[in-house]
């Protein structure tokens, strides 16, 4: 797992191509990242299934309850299959854009 801090956001990149192992590692180390917006980059995992993505839902919900953003990057995923409460985008740029928009919404009290 590769970790990169950019301002108020931490980017966690899966380097092994296994979303389940990546989720286990992120969950194990969650206390290190809970105060930051998170981008989880799953672009190395070419075989992401709906069930594989849904495994991230509890972590996403937990992070959002703490008033922080969690965005998943999955370029080869059918976004229409994902539940509305999950934010899944194809690129890092879009992930940063989503976080900026959510930060503005929180600042405005939405």
What kind of region is each of these model predictions?
Residues 60-82:
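Short aromatic-glycine-(Arg/Gly/Cys) micro-motifs in beta-strand/loop hairpins
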Residues 87-93:
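Short acidic-hydrophobic, aromatic-tinged amphipathic segments that line or gate anion-handling sites
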Residues 1-28, 44:
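STAS-typified acidic loop motif
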Residues 94-110:
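A charged, well-structured terminal subsegment
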Residues 12-14, 38-43, 72-73:
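Conserved beta-strand segments of the P-loop GTPase G domain that flank and frequently precede/overlap
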Residues 4-6, 31-35, 63-65:
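Flexible, charged surface loops at secondary-structure boundaries
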Residues 23, 27-53:
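Short, glycine-/small-residue-enriched flexible loop/hinge segments at domain edges that mediate gating
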Residues 54-58:
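Alpha-helical scaffolding segments of alpha/beta enzyme cores, especially the outer helices
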């Amino acid at each position: 797992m590769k970790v990169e801090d950019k301002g108020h956001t931490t980017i966690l990149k899966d380097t092994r191509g296994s979303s389940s192992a990546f989720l286990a590692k992120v969950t194990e180390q969650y206390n290190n990242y809970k105060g930051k917006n998170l981008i989880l980059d799953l672009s190395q995992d070419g075989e992401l299934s709906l069930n594989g993505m849904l495994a991230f839902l509890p972590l996403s919900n937990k992070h959002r309850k703490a008033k922080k953003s969690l965005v998943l990057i999955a370029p080869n995923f059918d976004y229409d299959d994902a539940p509305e409460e999950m934010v899944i985008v194809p690129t890092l740029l879009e992930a940063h854009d989503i976080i900026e928009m959510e930060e503005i919404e929180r600042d405005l009290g939405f």
